[in-house]
Amino acid sequence: MRDLFAPWGLDVPERALREMTLDSRIAAAGDLFVAVVGHQTDGRRYIPQAIAQGVAAIVAEADGVAPDVSVAEIHGVPVIYLRNLNQHLSTLAGQFYHQPGAALRLVGVTGTNGKTTTTQLLAQWSQALGETSAVMGTVGNGLLGQVIPTENTTGSAVDIQHLLRNLVDQGATFAAMEVSSHGLIQDRVAALSFAAVVFTNLSRDHLDYHGNMTSYEAAKWLLFSTHQSEHKIINADDDVGRRWLSQLPQAVAVSMAGNVPKGWNGPWLSANKVIYHDNGASIAFDSSWGEGELESRLMGAFNVSNLLVALATLLVQGYPMAQLLAAAPHLQPVCGRMEVFNAPGKPTVVVDYAHTPDALEKALAAARLHCTGKLWCVFGCGGDRDKGKRPLMGGIAEQLADCVVVTDDNPRSEEPQAIVADILSGLLDAGRVQAIHGRAEAVTSAIMQAKEDDVVLIAGKGHEDYQLVGNRRLDYSDRVTVARLLGGQA
């Protein structure tokens, strides 16, 4: 324990520490309990409980209760008080778990959309070239093929270092991590050293937390301005990305639409030609590393963008282009992200996690590229979240799909009828839309009505296998519902 707090010049008693935890419910004998002041609760209230459970020591937020950097004792248990503990947590946890991030190649990916697919592509692609790869993010954490589901995109600063330590101990040599704006603002990845950091795009999301787009952009920018990274990869097709490139002359500029800045002197990768077909896309590109052609099984223009960004990220780190291109056709779409389900004589069904106006627009545009018949859209909006996006999403569905079915998503504590009414308020002609509250019923209805050459996009839940109604968590999966209707397995 002395080594852990040596940077603060504190004289603390020597104790052997077993684990480091923020959760008093699981704190046990020999642990270091961390008492931070969070958004919802003050962890210092749980110090007595942690002591009762036999923790070896406590580190707590000093603000308002103790001198800025000080040591006290409660019932024989040393309590180290540090001011702004949240800001130091990543460093402390890194020390505690012996700097696991330095033992593997760590890539951080941020942006509103595309984080999950890009991290999965990076992990799959690097593993195909001999790495033992892991992912950390929305779908879960763990080695590829052994991913355990998670609650938050970016865990606490302690969780992240602990997880990295476990991954290194399991043999991981490469990890691709989704980095959320919440995680950046709360310093959860502050002490990590990234081999590369990636920006996908920025659009309306999490405004219930950030308040406005300026704050949201500033949160994302932290990964490129205040965090340590060897390489920076920026999507130049995004307005914010292009603006950032002017401040990042050494970054890799990536575009699928000819948006690499004129006179760009840094590394770059740009698509020349993209052909969409039933089974994915063929992409011809040019770059600082030479030209090539990429065959992909993923759907939609934004997945072309995700692929190019992932490719550039691996090229700039020295992975050989020929091997990357040979592995590309074997890359799999992410579970519940533009995931395609087919059956003879049935419509093509695409399950996607799109739950923002921008993501829904992109998902519909993507499905349209591969659609020869009518395009159907089944979606809803979550309760107790940004209400401003509901009419926007209704308008987008009406504009871009031929047939729309509005249904429930995760209503939470709100009345499902009120959420649907908000969505319908954004339509020019609500009479063109079917509203079916039961989600399984809505999905079934759309698939039964659709013809063989139609495409049915089911948006909003993606990989989720539950539905939040009131305070209940019900078993429900779009993927399982679709697979049953098409006579297959999800």
Swiss-Prot record:
The pathway entry for this protein reads as:
Cell wall biogenesis; peptidoglycan biosynthesis
What is this protein's gene name?
A: murE
Q: Where in the cell is it found?
A: Cytoplasm
The record's Gene Ontology biological-process terms are: cell division; cell wall organization; peptidoglycan biosynthetic process; regulation of cell shape
**What protein name applies here?**
UDP-N-acetylmuramoyl-L-alanyl-D-glutamate--2,6-diaminopimelate ligase
Which parts of the sequence bind meso-2,6-diaminopimelate? Answer: R385, D409, N410, P411, R412, G460, E464
Q: Name one Pfam family in it.
A: Mur_ligase
**Gene3D superfamilies documented for this protein:** Mur ligase, C-terminal domain (3.90.190.20), Mur-like, catalytic domain (3.40.1190.10), MurE/MurF, N-terminal domain (3.40.1390.10)
Q: Which organism is it from?
A: Yersinia pestis
- Summarize the protein's role: Catalyzes the addition of meso-diaminopimelic acid to the nucleotide precursor UDP-N-acetylmuramoyl-L-alanyl-D-glutamate (UMAG) in the biosynthesis of bacterial cell-wall peptidoglycan.
Residue positions binding UDP-N-acetyl-alpha-D-muramoyl-L-alanyl-D-glutamate:
L22, S24, H39, Q40, T41, N152, T153, T154, S180, Q186, R188
The residues listed in the UniProt record as binding ATP, with positions renumbered to this chain, are: G111, T112, N113, G114, K115, T116, T117
Q: Give the top-level enzyme category.
A: ligase
**UniProt entry keywords in alphabetical sequence:** ATP-binding, Cell cycle, Cell division, Cell shape, Cell wall biogenesis/degradation, Cytoplasm, Ligase, Magnesium, Nucleotide-binding, Peptidoglycan synthesis
Reaction(s) catalysed by this chain's protein: UDP-N-acetyl-alpha-D-muramoyl-L-alanyl-D-glutamate + meso-2,6-diaminopimelate + ATP = UDP-N-acetyl-alpha-D-muramoyl-L-alanyl-gamma-D-glutamyl-meso-2,6-diaminopimelate + ADP + phosphate + H(+)
The highest taxon in the source lineage is Bacteria
Q: Name one GO molecular function term.
A: ATP binding
